[in-house]
From Swiss-Prot:
Family as reported in the entry's similarity comment: In the N-terminal section; belongs to the transposase 2 family.
Record-linked NCBIfam families: guided_TnpB (NF040570), IS200/IS605 family accessory protein TnpB-like domain (TIGR01766)
Gene Ontology molecular functions: DNA binding; metal ion binding
InterPro entries xref list: Cas12f1-like_TNB
Record-listed Zn(2+) binding positions: C222, C225, C239, C242
Source taxon at top rank: Archaea
Keyword Cell membrane tagged: no
Protein name: TnpB-like protein MJ0751
Provenance organism: Methanocaldococcus jannaschii (strain ATCC 43067 / DSM 2661 / JAL-1 / JCM 10045 / NBRC 100440) (Methanococcus jannaschii)
Keywords of the record: DNA recombination, DNA-binding, Metal-binding, Transposable element, Transposition, Zinc
Length: 278
């Protein structure tokens, strides 16, 4: 179909030099996209015309950035740890975000569902309706929280002009299935892949590159010499060969960088691990 989009209307060509004009009713939210199109930041995709509506997809024109630093992100059940390196392997910054709010969201809705099940056990239709209602609310709250986390991480990525490295979690389900039932339940609630999707989407929207790295043994090996790390107290791991002690979450971000760059050493950051609740 040949057409000409003019912002507030669309002209559909029916024959040479003949066309029909359709005036568009747009909301204030949709007007923002039209303004971006007028400014040359968006392109028009394939228009779909239905009986009562017209779907006009916009495509953002993205110019890929030349990165100056590298950001590695390790996503855990209780926290998200990220490190930023320069291209020589010097650690510029390492931060751990505690994501306890996510656990609280799941726990609160789990308690609500238990109460509903007990109260309406003899009213299956009403029970089903309410369970679906609260499941929807839980999903929206979780996604809103994940959006906020990913937005913060991308703001950090833009500040340092980075390429982002994350774990390739393609086979995470197979690994999780070998764990206990309680562990599987907790991990199924924590949607790692959805957070990664939000991060990648926002990163590419701003022209940042994203790569995935095989996470095998990233939390078990010394990033300096490659020897196996041994437990050395709460959340700490020690390399008996290098005689160095690492935070278990931080070492994963170091090894992600090492795997992607094939480098053998790191220079410690000037300041220690920064902690933050999100």
């Amino acid at each position: 179909m040949l057409f000409k989009f003019e912002g507030d209307k669309i002209k559909i060509i029916t024959a040479p030099r003949k066309f029909i004009t359709i005036n568009l009713v747009v909301s204030d939210y949709q007007k923002k996209f039209i303004e971006e199109w007028k400014n040359g930041n968006f392109k028009i995709g394939e228009v779909i015309i239905k009986k009562d509506s017209i779907i006009i997809p916009f495509k953002k024109v993205v110019n890929p950035k030349n990165f100056e630093h590298i950001m590695t992100i390790d996503i855990n059940e209780k926290n998200i740890t990220y490190s930023i390196f320069d291209k020589d392997g010097n650690v510029i910054k390492t931060t751990r975000l505690d994501v306890y709010k996510l656990k609280r969201i799941h726990e609160n809705f789990s308690k609500k569902r238990e109460k509903i099940q007990k109260k309406l056990s003899n009213k299956p239709m009403k029970l089903k309706t309410l369970m679906e209602k609260y499941s929807g609310r839980e999903k929206r709250k979780v996604e809103d929280y994940l959006h906020k986390i990913s937005k913060f991480l991308i703001s950090e990525a833009l500040k340092y002009n980075v390429k982002i490295l994350m774990e390739d979690l393609t086979n995470i389900r197979e690994a999780v299935n070998k764990k206990s039932k309680n562990f599987r339940r907790r991990l199924n609630r924590w949607n790692f892949s959805k957070l990664q999707f939000f991060i990648e989407y926002k990163a590419k929207w701003d022209g940042l590159d994203v790569e995935y790295v095989n996470p095998s043994r990233t939390s078990k090996l010394c990033p300096i010499c490659g020897c196996k790390l041994d437990p050395n107290g709460q959340r700490l791991l020690k390399c008996n060969n290098c005689n160095l002690v690492f935070d278990r979450d931080v070492v994963a971000t170091f090894n992600l960088f090492k795997k992607s760059q094939d480098v053998g050493s790191f220079r410690s950051p000037e300041r220690s691990l920064m902690k933050s609740s999100y």
